[in-house]
Amino acid sequence: MSDAVAQTGLLNEGRALVDTANEHNIALRLVGGLAIRVLTPDLPPRTSTGQDLDFASASATRRALTDLITERGYSPDKNFNALYGNRQLYFANPETGLSIDVLIDKFHMCHTLDFADRLTRLPYTLDPIDLLLSKLQIVELNEKDADDCLRLLVTFPLEDSSDAAAMDLRVFRDLMGQDWGWWRTVTMNLDRIAALLNDGDRPAIEGGKLDPRAQLEVLRQTAESAPRSRSWKMRSRIGERKRWYDVPEETPHH
């Protein structure tokens, strides 16, 4: 099976799960690379051999979602879900080999991102600004994640708007002004992505409609000009002498 065929199968299953959840009034949206593929259909797809589906959902419908996914042939990891189910759920389908990760209300990785208020803005995926931030918060950003950021940046304009066809700069600005750690990681990654662009063409964004360098500059200027909270200023005095990010823990599945 080719990668393209496998990814199409994953995408179809992801959409079907979202549709079924909607029929039961359960908020479920794709996140990660597959979500970015949905939002950037005119760009070359990210190469992936994974067999996992990543979703975002809400704590209020966690039990109903567990029942729904189980009815579709997936087995819940009962130990994992008992320990971490307030923030993440895991399921696996023994027949297809597919697995499902569901983030509840927030991303908890190098930094914490609360997406609950924006969960249902788009029909199949989490909001593009949240997808962008979920990548920019990675302290050890790799080239695939950088390309995912660029895919979003050449597709969606940055605006002070909740328009579904744009990325809402207000969300970005508020986060950059509230949390110095977030600001430090994001500005570091903006510089890394800009350096990648300077190294040569990025095939991942061939056909993009927006200038990635201009978009990166908008983000950089917004991060620098965001009104800064008292806690931001206090933490900035400590700077990098103290680790400003969390180290994501590896949580085994069974």
Which residues make up each language-model segment?
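Short gly/ser-rich anion-binding loops that grip negatively charged ligand groups
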Residues: 7, 55, 59, 77, ...
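Catalytic nucleophile loop
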Residues: 32
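Short, active-site-adjacent cap segments at secondary-structure transitions
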Residues: 35-38
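Catalytic metal-binding acidic patch
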Residues: 41-65, 69, 149
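Conserved catalytic core of two-metal-ion nucleotidyltransferases
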Residues: 66, 70-111
